[in-house]
């Protein structure tokens, strides 16, 4: 990541909105923003393979559900945050991931400029590809600051997105069971 370019760009934005980039409260802002971007965009170019490839053998194929995984990310359209909770269900095929690995999977894909629909897809596809799940179902509910603080200005509005892979695509009863276990 080119932090010098980020700092220069932030300084230009500060000046472009009519502020003094040398004012006491703004002097360090370009460097702070560059450090923040290094942190919140640390998922760029990464996948969840390293997390999901560490799995444990299991005999049965009962559904695994982890819900209320908090995340935050940046909307790629306005570079404003959106945040919320991810709910994940999957059907193992002989292997299960450690519970923290599901949260880490959400984290990897949320640490980059993102849209909610793609975040759903990337998490579900990672479970299928790297864990070898028989099915994956991901529900994300989030509040978007680009809707809350600008434009339509409707704070508190939740957007829900879902994606189903494998067995969840074809089995409505399985999806319904996942919804119930997620409390949705």
UniProtKB/Swiss-Prot annotation:
Quaternary assembly: Homomer.
Taxonomy, superkingdom: Bacteria
Keywords: GTP-binding, Hydrolase, Metal-binding, Nucleotide-binding, One-carbon metabolism, Zinc
Residues annotated for Zn(2+) binding in this entry: 75, 78, 146
This protein's name: GTP cyclohydrolase 1
Species of provenance: Streptococcus pneumoniae (strain ATCC 700669 / Spain 23F-1)
KW Hydrolase (keyword) present: yes
PANTHER family, per database record: GTP CYCLOHYDROLASE 1, GTP CYCLOHYDROLASE I
SUPFAM superfamilies (UniProt xref): Tetrahydrobiopterin biosynthesis enzymes-like (SSF55620)
GO cellular component: cytoplasm
């Amino acid at each position: 990541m080119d932090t010098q370019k980020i700092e220069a760009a932030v300084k230009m934005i500060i000046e472009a909105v009519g502020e003094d980039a040398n004012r006491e409260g703004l002097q360090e802002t370009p460097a702070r923003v560059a450090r923040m971007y290094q942190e919140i965009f640390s998922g760029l170019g990464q996948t969840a393979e390293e997390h999901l490839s560490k799995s444990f053998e299991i005999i049965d194929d009962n559904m695994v559900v982890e819900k209320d995984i908090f995340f935050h990310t940046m909307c790629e359209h306005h570079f404003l945050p959106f945040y919320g909770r991810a709910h994940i269900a999957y059907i193992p095929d002989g292997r299960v991931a450690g519970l923290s690995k599901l949260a880490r999977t959400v984290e990897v894909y949320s640490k980059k400029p993102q849209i909610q629909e793609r975040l759903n897809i990337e998490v579900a596809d990672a479970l299928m590809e790297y864990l070898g799940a028989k099915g994956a179902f991901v529900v994300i509910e989030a509040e978007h600051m680009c809707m809350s603080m600008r434009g339509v200005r409707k704070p508190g509005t939740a957007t829900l997105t879902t994606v189903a892979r494998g067995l969840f695509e074809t089995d409505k009863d399985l999806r319904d069971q996942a919804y119930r276990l997620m409390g949705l």
